[in-house]
Design a protein with these regions (language model features):
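Asp-based, Mg2+/Mn2+-dependent phosphohydrolase catalytic module
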Residues: 1-9, 102, 106, 115-222
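N-terminal helical cap/lid subdomain that shapes the substrate entry/recognition surface
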Residues: 2-99, 110, 121-123
Length: 222
C-alpha cells in the first residue's frame, strides 16, 4: 500500500492516545461491592451510558460523567453519590499516554502537523496533551465545538478551524462508534484504526489497522 501523506493527521485523544481508565476508576469505587462478573457488567453499562449522554445538545463533561455513572449505579443496584462522579471527573486530566504513544507521535510530528479532536473540556485537555511527548498544531475540544463526537458538528468544527476538508485529513482513532463511523460518513477517506481492544474490527468503514501508535509512521511513509 502506498504511503498516505495528508495535510493534517487528526487524533482522538482519550482511549487512542491517553490511557482513558474509566474502568479503573469504577473498580476503585465499586469493586468492593460487586463481584467480578457484576463489576464487568457495571463497566459495560457505564461505557454505554457515556455514549448515550453525549448524543444530544452539548453539556459539560462533568455532567456526562455524573449522569452516566448515576444510571450505571441504578441499573446495577449500587448506591450513587455525587462525590463519586466528581472523583471520576477529576481523574481525567491525571491520565497519561499508552506506552507506545510518545515515540510514534514524535516521529510523525516532524513531518506532518498533528491535531487533536477530543471529547474534552478546555480546562482538562492540556494536562493530558502535555504528557504525550510531541507537539500538536491544534487541539480542539467538544466544549469549543459545542458538540461531542460522534456528532458531525464536532468534525465540521475542526474542518472549519483548519480551513480544510475531509480529503486533507488522516483521522486516527481506536473507536468506530465515536470516530471512524462519522469520519467515514463525512468523507474522510484516510483513516487509521488503532486496535486497542475496545471494539471489534469493522472493515466496512475502510481503514488501515495498526496495533499501536508505533505503527503510524509506516502508514505515512516515515
Amino acid at each position: 500500500m502506498a504511503p498516505i501523506r495528508p495535510k493534517y493527521i487528526s487524533f482522538d485523544c482519550y482511549g487512542t492516545l491517553i490511557n482513558f481508565d474509566m474502568a479503573g476508576a469504577a473498580r476503585d469505587l465499586y469493586g468492593d461491592r460487586l463481584d467480578a462478573q457484576a463489576m464487568d457488567k457495571f463497566i459495560r453499562n457505564f461505557s454505554a451510558y457515556r455514549l448515550d449522554e453525549i448524543m444530544g445538545a452539548w453539556k459539560p463533561y462533568a455532567d456526562v460523567v455524573h449522569n452516566s455513572l448515576s444510571r450505571a449505579c441504578k441499573a446495577n443496584g449500587v448506591t450513587f453519590k455525587d462525590e463519586d462522579a466528581q472523583m471520576v471527573y477529576e481523574r481525567v486530566p491525571t491520565w497519561g499516554p499508552h506506552p507506545d504513544v510518545p515515540a510514534g507521535l514524535a516521529k510523525v510530528a516532524k513531518e506532518i502537523p498533528l491535531v487533536i479532536l477530543s471529547n474534552a473540556m478546555n480546562a482538562q485537555i492540556m494536562s493530558n496533551v502535555e504528557k504525550l511527548g510531541a507537539p500538536f498544531h491544534k487541539v480542539y475540544t467538544a466544549e469549543q465545538a459545542q458538540a461531542y463526537k460522534p456528532r458531525f458538528q464536532a468534525f465540521e468544527y475542526m474542518f472549519d478551524m483548519l480551513g480544510c476538508g475531509p480529503e486533507d485529513m488522516l483521522h486516527v482513532s481506536s473507536s468506530f462508534r465515536y470516530d471512524l463511523m462519522s469520519a467515514h460518513d463525512l468523507g474522510i477517506k484516510n483513516k487509521v484504526w488503532v486496535n486497542r481492544g475496545h471494539e471489534p474490527a469493522n472493515p466496512y468503514y475502510g481503514y488501515t489497522e495498526i496495533a499501536d501508535i508505533s505503527g503510524l509512521p509506516g502508514v505515512v511513509g516515515l
